[in-house]
A protein has these predicted regions:
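Glycine-rich phosphate-binding loop of nucleotide-binding enzymes
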Residues: 1-24
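Flexible glycine/proline-rich, aromatic-decorated loop/lid segments
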Residues: 18-54
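Long, low-complexity segments enriched in small/aliphatic residues
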Residues: 88-183
Length: 277
């Protein structure tokens, strides 16, 4: 669906560090900077810790800093923002985001990083979220808990599509491989449809044998790999190798009504022997 929508655009501009599949469709490519070594700014880790990032190497010829690209685009649209400055932009973010308000560059450098939320420059940041809930006596309301009712996936199983497919990543690869496929890995392996050994017997297919995997939206061909960690009736495909196996040709574009999360993890499929002509 994304390929169809992007292909229908009259003009597509992509800014990226790598020549991705999306960049291949672009009319204009703006080569961006490598945030981890070529640009000034901040980085936020998965523990909510904000730290300073400094440019370690100069930009290659023909490459602009991401800030410079945005500022030049603004200028083309009639907005003069002056000269790009990472600290000025960060301070603008602090004004708009209360949980970052206390994180000046000076404090980030002195403390080696601060965990959000940090509401003012006297605030130390919070090691864990919702800390007030653990205070004695409790300040403010208690956390609401309530039971939720189970709702089946939109893509229902039946006799025609009896297997539940879930998608995901391999340990050594990341998404479509724009970053991770550029280096070799002893763990890397080709795309496979992973099945339980019991399902291999049920459908009379062997390890390495090609099968056709079909859903209500499309089909792909992939070799079988047995995984004893999968229960019968559950299959797995990675999302990394679109040229080998176009996994998302199978998945559904339904979304969770509350979170908006795509239901990529629950596709109804069937597998059939494949005769390679």
């Amino acid at each position: 669906r994304a390929v169809k929508l992007l292909g229908g655009l009259k003009f597509l501009v992509v800014q990226d560090l790598f020549y991705t599949k999306t960049a291949e469709m672009a009319d204009v490519i703006l080569p961006g900077s490598a945030g981890w070594c070529e640009t000034e700014g901040t980085v936020t880790s998965s523990e909510r810790r904000v730290q300073r990032v400094r440019a370690a190497v100069p930009l290659p010829d023909g490459v602009l800093d991401d800030m410079e690209i945005v500022f030049r685009l603004a200028r083309q649209f009639g907005h003069e923002w002056g000269k790009p400055d990472a600290e000025t932009i960060w301070n603008e973010l602090r004004q708009l985001s209360p949980m970052h308000a206390g994180m000046s560059y000076k404090r980030l450098e002195e403390l080696g990083g601060i965990q959000w939320p940090c509401y003012d420059e006297a605030h130390p940041g919070e090691m864990y979220l919702h800390s007030r809930l653990w205070q004695e006596p409790l300040i403010g309301p208690r956390a609401p808990f309530h039971a939720v009712e189970f709702e089946s996936p939109v893509d229902e199983l039946n006799e025609q599509f009896p297997i539940r497919l879930t998608t995901g990543r391999y340990l050594d690869s990341y998404n479509t491989g724009a970053q991770s496929e550029r280096f070799p890995s002893p763990l890397r392996r080709a795309a496979t449809i992973d099945l339980s050994p019991e399902d291999g017997e049920r459908y009379q297919v062997g390890e390495g044998e090609k099968v056709r995997v079909s859903s209500r939206r499309g089909s792909v061909v992939a070799p079988v790999r047995f995984d004893s960690g999968l229960r019968p009736g559950l299959a797995f495909l990675s999302v990394h190798f679109h040229e080998q196996v176009a996994t998302n040709d199978l998945t559904i574009d339904a979304v969770d009504p509350k979170s908006g999360t795509s239901e990529f993890k629950a596709t109804a499929i069937r597998i059939e022997k494949y005769l390679d002509n």
